């Protein structure tokens, strides 16, 4: 529909003017599972007729990766990166006009106005805050300026004989601190 068609029959789409379309993809080096996922992305893109190549021919060590992304390397067309919102999900920290970690560089007036509402004193009202976040979610879904592909999760096993353990221990969100931990028995609970 956008005019990118396979005009020479090689199974890959060309630019609208008929020239070769190649997309450079940057991804961080992490673990074997990530390397497999990156290769799978390349296969899926090829299946829909896109010639996507790894920028530098391989995944990139994390520090170098983020240096290149933050520098807006013109050779990178699309990238896969990780991020988290921490305890405050305010999108201003990742998608604001001056946000240091706005790696997508996507900013427009509509999104900025929603972020301003989320960051306003009006958002102290819980119902308004929920309304503003729902508006942001609808906006982000509609614009699709980034596409989440993975959600991190962790499981922490703690024996029942340990009291006051908290997975966020030693963070400002924790209600417990390390000095409060107790072990109630010499033998593990079963």
At which residue positions do the language-model features occur?
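Detector for C-terminal structural segments
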Residues: 1, 33-43, 67-190
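Ligand/substrate-recognition segments at binding pockets and active sites
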Residues: 4-82
């Amino acid at each position: 529909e956008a005019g990118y068609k396979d005009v020479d029959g090689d199974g890959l789409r060309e630019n609208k003017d008929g020239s070769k379309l190649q997309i450079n993809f940057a991804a961080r080096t992490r673990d074997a599972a990530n390397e497999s996922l990156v290769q799978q992305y390349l296969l899926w893109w090829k299946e829909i007729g896109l010639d996507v190549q790894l920028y530098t021919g391989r995944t990139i060590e994390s520090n170098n990766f983020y240096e290149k992304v933050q520098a807006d390397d013109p050779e990178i067309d699309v990238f896969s990166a990780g991020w988290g919102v921490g305890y405050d999900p305010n999108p201003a920290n990742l998608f604001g006009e001056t946000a240091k970690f706005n790696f997508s560089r996507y900013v427009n007036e509509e999104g900025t106005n929603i972020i301003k509402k989320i960051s306003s004193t009006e958002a102290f009202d819980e119902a308004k805050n929920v309304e503003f976040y729902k508006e942001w979610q609808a906006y982000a879904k509609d614009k699709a300026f980034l596409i989440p592909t993975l959600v991190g999760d962790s499981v922490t096993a703690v024996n029942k004989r340990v009291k006051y353990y908290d997975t966020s221990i030693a963070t400002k969100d924790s209600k417990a601190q390390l000095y409060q931990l107790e072990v109630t028995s010499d033998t593990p609970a079963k």
